[in-house]
Design a protein with these regions (language model features):
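ATP-dependent adenylation/nucleotidyltransferase module used to activate substrates
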Residues: 1-157, 168, 177-178, 184
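AMP-forming adenylation/ATP pyrophosphatase catalytic core
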Residues: 127-133, 139-358
Length: 358
């Protein structure tokens, strides 16, 4: 392989420091910002999103300070198809998606990787907090970042062996505070820039408002049901609810009520008390295995069912393109559409999209 790399630059601190570290290692680097959407096309202001002109200018400033060529690649068509449309379709079907995983799967480590190959560059570099290593059998491994509070391996479980072999995560062995210190020492314009939060294309955290504005649809009110199927109130459209949600229900009860299930076919939302949210068996499809080519028999792992979840002990089995995890202890508010990610210590075994919960 050559020492030529494409640095995916968002305009934030982490990708800027990743670029600096790669230059320090002697790599021939070019900086690239992926233009994922035109803000006016999806009805948000530039101040509240990534891909804004400010972000592009921040990335350009850092690239130039590092004497590194810089380009903006327009991937907006793919982003609309592979991320936004999938995001909307999921909520319309009572599923809670993770668009960051789709963006990694279809854009950062697919479309950008293919563009890097066209430019005769062997590596894609990002500011993710994770690590890539190679085991004694020549298999590439995805590992947690040393800074567990910033670890992003959960949203990277979809990377293939081919992609991992051409991916570098320079920040995987440092803390966020160290990254900021480097940015400040180099005088980067974005050294004190706040970390990005929530979903990049959703303004003010209201994903349901975004969906209604983007699609032009009005999602009809429907019935809230209790666990026995009795009508106990009215909801404001199924896209506004996700499993485990308590806020915004507007239902009085002796104990707090939570969303247990969303059924777009009947246009109903089932509510339950907290003790009705627990489940032990989680099935995932569209799987990607990293540390092993397949899971034979039963495998003991720790597993996460959402990004901020602390991984828990489970026994996992594989059946074709699905995996089933049986947790030692019931887990709260496991949600279809999120990722089930398996860990062996700090190594990602693999994962998939949750399709069934019992």
């Amino acid at each position: 392989m050559n020492n030529k790399a494409v640095i995916a630059m968002s305009g934030g601190v982490d990708s800027s420091v990743a670029a600096y570290l790669m230059k320090q290692r002697g790599f021939d680097c070019i900086g690239v910002t992926m233009k994922l959407f035109a803000n006016e096309d999806i009805g948000i202001s530039r101040e509240h999103s990534c891909c804004s002109l400010d972000d592009v200018e921040d990335a350009r400033s850092v690239a130039y300070s590092l004497d590194m060529p810089y380009y903006v690649f327009n991937f907006s068509d793919r982003f609309e198809t592979d991320v936004i449309d999938r995001f909307i379709h999921a909520y319309e079907n009572g599923i809670t998606p993770n668009p960051c995983i789709d963006c990694n799967r279809y854009l950062k480590f697919d479309k950008l990787y293919m563009r890097a190959k066209e430019l005769d560059r062997d590596y894609v570099v990002t500011g993710h907090y994770a690590r890539v290593e190679k085991d004694g059998n020549g298999r590439f491994l995805l590992k947690k970042a040393l800074d567990n509070t910033k670890d992003q391996s959960y949203v990277l479980y979809c990377l293939t062996q081919e992609q991992l072999s051409h991916t570098i995560f320079p920040l995987g062995e440092m803390r966020k505070s160290q990254a900021r210190e480097i940015a400040e020492s180099q005088g980067f314009i974005n050294a004190r820039k706040a970390d990005s939060q929530d979903i990049c294309f959703v303004q003010n955290g209201s994903y349901a408002d975004f969906i209604e504005q983007y699609t032009g649809k009005n999602y009809p009110d429907g019935d809230f049901l209790d666990k026995d199927g009795n009508i106990i109130g009215r909801h404001k459209g199924v896209i506004r609810y996700t499993v485990g949600q308590r806020k915004g229900l507007g239902i009085s009860a002796p104990e707090p009520l939570y969303v247990k299930a969303v059924n777009p076919v009947s246009n109903t939302v089932t509510l339950s008390y907290n003790d009705g949210l627990y489940s032990s068996i989680v099935k995932a499809g569209d799987i990607n295995l990293i540390s092993v080519p397949e899971i034979k028999g039963e495998m003991r792992v720790k597993a996460k069912v959402r990004y901020r979840h602390t991984e828990q002990w489970a026994t996992v089995t594989q059946n074709g393109d699905t995996i089933t995890a049986v947790f030692d202890e019931p887990q709260r508010a496991v949600t279809c559409g999120q990722a089930l990610v398996l860990y062996d210590g700090d190594t990602v075994v693999g994962g998939g999209t949750i399709i069934e919960v019992e």
